[in-house]
From Swiss-Prot:
The gene is atpA. It is found in: Cellular thylakoid membrane. This is ATP synthase subunit alpha. NCBIfam families: atpA, PRK13343.1. The record marks S363 as: Required for activity. It comes from the Bacteria. ATP binds at G170, D171, R172, Q173, T174, G175, K176, S177. Its main location: membrane.
Length: 505
């Protein structure tokens, strides 16, 4: 028979009384009523707040969007293969946040900030809410510093400043992403942190872009946020806000940042899909009523901060895809009205061989003029007007048999200006090279050069300056002005290159 020792029992009881923890954990738990198409209807989450993160029992996360009388409509941020009718759902009391910090540079992440490039975890402890309020009026200052894209036609005619929102708009396959990638490549050595947000794109396209950035040494200062075409609509909807949050971290540290949203049309379509499945009333083109707010609250986060706030900036280049050049559709008109100007790319110009295919007539930068460097502003003032007039004359001259000499001369110069502004992909030019090329065209110094030789002339001019006039390039890059001495040097170089070229033609 087992002997019972009272002292042992009392010591066990004492131990249990000492270790007794009477803390009670209260969690708000609900039950899945219905699930499908990335949407869950949940009963019982009485205390949940709009936009709150939810946790399903298989670990999938969701966001509560519709708070109704008898149920909550939530979107799922994953496959949710383990979630079924009757599954438990817990509210977390948190809003979606994303990891931020220096360690994010050079990495490819999903909209939740999780790495998807196979390089392991990101060593950062800082986080930031995905949805943040935009800086107020007092925290901002006007745009006054240039954000050089390296693309001559943009920097000369549609300049972009740090803290500006400049829309890139055009049909599919007209070179919208190419302009954005060139701008990222041109920030090398400028101490600008870039964030490229790919929304609803093919995984192969994103992999190709990452490889291009890596080859040109641009991935070191770039964060790529990707929500592929196969991802749930909720992740495609969140991706731009994640990109903005990552850039905001650097902006509030006083750094210049550049964010590319490629493209917001697909984000709007993902949001429309979610809204219709949540049974929200459809409006124009079946988009929900708050689709304007979807984009305005995102793009308002781009700003040039005041000196008291550290002087950082976030420049946003949203991309919008049009159908058959129709800029009067719902989403294009919304984003045009929110942004500080647009760069319009034309399929006709692209197919005619003009690349970048910028339609100068309807492209505009509303605030970038104040940020343009004096060197390029001095010589490019008439460039936009001349090209716009050339387009009109070119259309008119197709029907006119005999043209007067002045018109003929204007047409010839316009053709040469067009050729000068052609630029291959992934080859951004610095300020001095742009000044030299534009000066040669605007001042009529290459009117004698045959049109088909203009591109070759521009290349030779740039090479000559690099080899023989390095001090000219240094002076322009340092002073950002074209004084009389530099202008005389430039004219001399242009004439020299032109003479040697015409001698061989």
């Amino acid at each position: 028979m087992v002997s019972i020792r009272p002292d042992e029992i009392s010591s066990i009881l004492k131990q249990q009384i000492t270790d007794y923890d009477q803390s009670v954990s209260v969690s708000n738990v609900g039950t899945v009523l219905q699930i499908g198409d990335g949407i869950a209807r949940i009963y019982g989450l009485d205390q949940v707040m709009a936009g709150e993160l939810l946790e399903f029992e298989d670990g999938t996360e969701g966001i509560a969007l519709n708070l109704e009388d008898d149920n909550v409509g939530a979107v799922l941020m994953g496959e949710a293969l383990g979630v079924q009718e009757g599954s438990n759902v817990k509210s977390t009391g948190k809003i979606a946040s994303v990891p931020v910090g220096e360690a994010m540079q050079g990495r490819v992440v999903n909209p939740l900030g999780q790495p998807i490039d196979g390089k392991g975890e990101i060593p950062t402890s800082d986080t930031r809410l995905i949805e943040e309020m935009a800086p107020g009026i007092i925290k901002r200052r006007s745009v006054h510093e240039p954000m050089q894209t390296g693309i001559t036609s943009i920097d000369a005619m549609i300049p972009v400043g740090r803290g500006q929102r400049e829309l890139i708009i055009g049909d599919r396959q007209t070179g919208k992403s190419a302009i954005a990638i060139d701008t990222i490549i041109n920030q090398k050595g400028q101490d600008v942190v870039c964030v490229y947000v790919a929304i609803g794109q093919k995984s192969a396209s994103v992999a190709n872009i990452v490889e291009v950035l890596r080859e040109r040494g641009a991935l070191d200062y770039t964060v790529v946020v990707s929500a592929g075409a196969s991802e749930p609509a909720a992740l495609q909807y969140l991706a731009p806000y994640t990109g903005a949050a990552i850039a905001e971290h650097f902006m509030y540290q006083g750094k210049a940042t550049l964010v590319i949203y490629d493209d917001l049309t697909k984000q709007a379509q993902a949001y429309r899909q979610m809204s219709l499945l949540l049974k929200r009333p459809p409006g124009r083109e079946a988009y929900p009523g708050d689709v304007f707010y979807l984009h305005s609250r995102l793009l308002e986060r781009a700003a040039k901060l005041s000196d008291a706030m550290g002087g950082g900036s976030m420049t946003a280049l949203p991309i919008i895809e049009t159908q058959a050049g129709d800029v009067s559709a719902y989403i294009p008109t919304n984003v045009i009205s929110i942004t500080d100007g647009q760069i319009f790319l034309s399929a006709d110009l692209f197919n005619s061989g003009l690349r970048p295919a910028i339609n100068v007539g309807i492209s505009v930068s509303r605030v970038g003029g104040a940020a343009q460097t004096k060197a390029i502003k001095k010589i490019a003032g008439t460039l936009k007007l001349e090209l716009a007039q050339f387009d009109e004359l070119a259309a008119f001259s197709q029907f006119a048999s005999d043209l007067d000499e002045a018109t003929q001369q204007q047409l010839e110069r316009g053709k040469r200006l067009r050729e000068l502004l052609k630029q291959p992909q992934f080859s951004p030019l610095n300020l001095a090279e742009q000044v030299a090329v534009v000066y040669a065209g605007v001042k009529g110094l290459i009117d004698e050069v045959p049109v088909e030789e203009v591109t070759k002339f521009a290349t030779e001019l740039r090479e000559y300056l690099k080899l023989n006039k390095a001090e000219f390039i240094e002076e322009i890059l340092k002073e950002k002005k074209l004084n009389d001495g530099l202008e005389a040097t430039l004219k001399e170089v242009i004439n020299e290159v032109k003479s040697s070229m015409l001698a061989t033609v």
